Amino acid sequence: MPVLIESIGNLERRLTFSVPEDRLESHVDERLREIARAARINGFRAGKVPAKVIEQRFGEKVRAEVLDSLLRETLDSAIRAHSLRLAGAARIDHANEGGLNFVATFEVVPDFGEIDVSKLGVVRRTAKVTDVDIDQMIENLRLQRRTWRVAEHGAQVGYLVALETWSQAGDERLPIEGVEAGSTILGSGVMFEQIERGLEGLSKGDENVLDVTFPDDWRVMQLAGKAVQVHVKVIEVSEPVLLEVNEEFIKSFGVKSGKLEDFRADIRANLERELKGALVSHLRREIGEQLIAAYAHVEMPPRLVEKEARLMLAKQIEQIRLSGRDPTVIPDDAHIGFMDAACKRVLVGLLVGEIAGRNRLRLDPMRVTETLHLIASTYEEPEEVFQMYRNDPKLMEGVQSLVMEEQVIEWIADRAQKTEQVLSFQEAIQQ
């Protein structure tokens, strides 16, 4: 039967086609003959198994495999012949029970019209890692490994304070009885800023009453937006003890030589990797936002958007599960809340693909390899991780998609109207 294409929506198509029976049978016979030449079945010599036995043993499975292969091949050929550009995978159903006529339903890429990226405005941020940044990172590492000793003087920023508190908000006392025990490192923001400031200078056994006004969005509902008197009693004050940056300390971070210069070089490499990721991420986000603004009027394939929304919901459910909370309380239609964000993701993804296709941008294999090495370098066994990615098609597909998107984003940035902005390392990674 001839291929029949129907429009069943602005972006949805239905394609009716058939797999030639003689071609199917020819491929099945050829595959069964290949199996017969190598089959080892009890009671028969190798290569001498009767065709009827081979058919009984393998016929059904081989026919299904060959039909699936021919289905895809025939559909791909029809799609190419009619210059169709699919947005997502096609759903294939039998057109008649048990026959060889099929119906493929799919969505197509919308028409974006002219894509002129030269009208976009891009801020190209640049930054570099300095010795000061390395010094700061070493101090952060020392803080991570710090120990505590009881302080003989009042609390300062960076000190650990163990305390008991109770609060009075009008006629309401929290807790209703007794006190709440807790601790905070002054300056860390674990407790509300006004409380932490009120603890500075206090020593073990000191008590104080702090007048605090909590913001409207404060996490404790009974205190949100209220002026509260917080009663505090200091139980203990501890000061930090930082480790010396010596050979033992350096080796504990995987620097086998234990030398300071090697340690600093390792830190520089890590910071530069972090910086590059931050700059690329910011550029991707900025260009993505501009593409969304410029092409928000273009209708997106609804099934593709819904699929993306469900994927976003699935990720959130997994995060909820990993945090120990119960994900079953999420309603079945919760994906609807992700539809707007999903539509934007689909829009940017399709535009990236469209720009790559129109301008014949090709995936850079060297860049893929560099990205793999970059990913692997963050693990204890980088070579093992590198090979794991290389041998896993799904992992490789994810890396290749990431690299291709970065190539397109850079291609756009090179042709857009640019403004240069020089930032410090800290400014770059915090934006």
UniProtKB/Swiss-Prot annotation:
Q: Which family does it belong to?
A: Belongs to the FKBP-type PPIase family. Tig subfamily.
Ranked from the top, the taxonomy reads: Bacteria, Pseudomonadati, Pseudomonadota, Gammaproteobacteria, Lysobacterales
Q: What is this protein called?
A: Trigger factor
User: A GO molecular function for this record?
Assistant: ribosome binding
Its Gene Ontology cellular component terms are: cytoplasm
Q: Which Pfam families match?
A: Trigger_C, Trigger_N
What is the role of the protein in this entry? Involved in protein export. Acts as a chaperone by maintaining the newly synthesized protein in an open conformation. Functions as a peptidyl-prolyl cis-trans isomerase.
Highest taxon listed in the record's lineage: Bacteria
Q: Where in the cell is it found?
A: Cytoplasm
Please classify the protein's predominant subcellular localization into one broad category.
cytoplasm
